[in-house]
UniProtKB/Swiss-Prot annotation:
Its cofactor is Mg(2+). It comes from Listeria innocua serovar 6a (strain ATCC BAA-680 / CLIP 11262). This is CCA-adding enzyme. Homodimer. Belongs to the tRNA nucleotidyltransferase/poly(A) polymerase family. Bacterial CCA-adding enzyme type 3 subfamily.
């Protein structure tokens, strides 16, 4: 049995010893059955939140209104959630009310897909009332109960369906795909932040092209930031070798290259990305547009390492040769990597000339920077001074 489950087992045992039901649930059980890596576990129990808090010495109210208590056991933290049913979903995301219950099957009924509605008890016996194991065997993404109801409860589940297709290389069952097609407009009620998380996970998957093909088939792109009317661009994006991706930022640079938005910053801000990512993508896109077959010394210097490595990564994803090692070596061999590396400063210029500060200081340093970069003069104080026409000290 997986070590992650074994380490968390005492939590289940304490709950059952106290007379309650307790199970591992959700993605950890699914990934165990798929022989995929498991990073953490979720635990569901018939114990109500206050009862959970009485059983364990160290607890935190992380989501107690929805039945979740964080339990600290063996120096690890585990989210323990009470079995529950949910009322109507007024905003296509959150239930209007949550009712705590004692039934595992009723709790599993509210979950999104059958492969995520399998529970495992302390003896590692599986409880699978909705045939999630069969769906896994058939490589099928099938909604629990009526797909239309599950998508109406939380519209993000439609994006999750496409993401799971990419991650697992599964397919949607007929009813789930039909509901996805018919209810796709509900996605407009979902926050961009949640959509962005699913998009990134989708592109990190193993079946990106199939996922984007489905996304376009159901016209999901209409409800994603900056994608309306961009089917051909997304088809091009999907055709690239995304298995060669090593950074998340490459995903966004790839989108900018494919979609060619008139305002890159606005396009990326619509996805709620950090300013640091937006700035890096802007610089990398400009560098990619201006780059020739090989990087010139000046291009490497002005691009800086993060930029040229990102450009190299997207070029590799798009089918060009990987030049990362070559570029890193060339960058390391540059005589300087920024103006701060120059052997002289503005203070030196003022001292040597006796002049007042002014624009001429920056202009002179720019000239020196260029000459050092091109190897015309060494980055050595007296040599620079001689080149400028001043007497040596």
């Amino acid at each position: 049995m997986n070590d992650v489950f074994l380490k968390a087992l005492p939590v289940l045992q304490k709950l059952t010893t106290a007379g309650f039901e307790a199970y591992f649930v959700g993605g950890s059980v699914r990934d165990y059955l798929l022989n995929r890596p498991i990073s953490d576990v979720d635990i569901a129990t018939s114990a109500f939140p206050e009862e959970v808090k009485e059983i364990f010495q160290s607890t935190y109210d992380t989501g107690i209104a929805h039945g979740t208590v964080t339990v600290r056991e063996n120096k690890e933290c585990y989210e323990v959630t009470t079995f529950r049913t949910e009322g109507t979903y007024e905003d296509f995301r959150r239930p209007s009310e949550v009712t705590f219950i004692r039934s595992l099957e009723e709790d599993l009924l509210r979950r999104d897909f059958t492969m995520n509605a399998i529970a495992m008890d302390e003896n590692f016996k599986l409880h699978d009332p909705f045939s999630g194991q069969l769906a896994i065997q058939n490589k099928e993404i099938k909604a629990v109960g009526k797909a239309s109801e599950r998508f109406h409860e939380d519209a993000l589940r439609m994006m999750r369906a496409v993401r799971f297709l990419s991650q697992l290389d599964f397919q949607l069952d007929k009813e789930t795909e039909t509901a996805l097609t018919n209810q796709i407009a509900l996605l407009q009620h979902t926050s961009v932040e949640r959509i962005t998380v699913e998009w990134i996970k989708m592109i990190k998957g193993q079946a990106v092209k199939r996922a984007i093909d489905l996304l376009l088939k159901v016209e999901m792109e209409t409800y994603l930031p900056g994608f309306k009317g961009e089917k051909s661009a997304l088809m091009e994006f999907a055709s690239w070798n995304w298995e060669k991706r090593t950074t998340e930022t490459a995903i966004w640079l790839g989108l900018v290259i494919a979609v060619k938005p008139s305002n890159i910053t606005a396009f990326l801000k619509a996805w709620k990305l950090p300013n640091k990512t937006i700035q890096l993508v802007n610089k990398a896109y400009e560098a990619a547009l201006n780059m020739k077959e090989t990087w010139l010394t000046e291009e490497l210097y002005h691009a800086q390492e993060a930029v040229f490595l990102l450009v190299n990564e997207i070029n590799n994803i798009r089918g060009q040769s990987d030049k990362e090692d070559e570029l890193k070596k060339a960058y390391e061999l540059l005589p300087i990597h920024s103006k701060k590396d120059l052997a002289i400063t503005g203070a030196d210029l003022l001292k040597w000339t006796g002049e007042n500060a002014g624009p001429w200081v920056k202009e002179t340093l720019d000239k020196v920077e260029c000459q050092v970069l091109l190897g015309k003069i060494n980055n050595e104080k007296n040599q620079i001074k001689r080149w400028l026409g001043y007497h040596e000290e």
